[in-house]
Amino acid sequence: MAIKLFPVTPEFAAEVGDVDLTQPLSPDDRAAIKAAFWKYGVLIFPAQSLTPEQHIEFAQLFGPLEPNINSYQDDVKQERIDARISDVSNLDHSNEILKADARKRLSGLANRLWHTDSIFRHVPARASLLYARSVAPIGGHT
């Protein structure tokens, strides 16, 4: 079954329907998703429940992944999720809410502001993928 696109606006952002990202994508679906990304810039895949491996496999559709910033920090434990995924949550390696003075929490405060990931790199990131495990019941259409 071919994917369906539901544009949020005519030129920017689209919701993608009739696709299950837990299953291997057909070559046609892969091409359609890439084309939609280049057309709309933001794609929304609602109601997906991905494992870290499935998330990584889907992300690789857009190209090679850059190293996670936590891989450069010796004092940051990254045992909660796959080290190839940047953890921008408010949870520590034991799934407990971070303390107010935790380094990870303090360094992540800037993520609350609009920004473009990896724009400082010589070759900036082509895309960023956000996988929300908990979305606000009202107004959560980010």
Enumerate the predicted regions with their spans.
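Fe(II)/2-oxoglutarate oxygenase catalytic core
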Residues: A2-T142
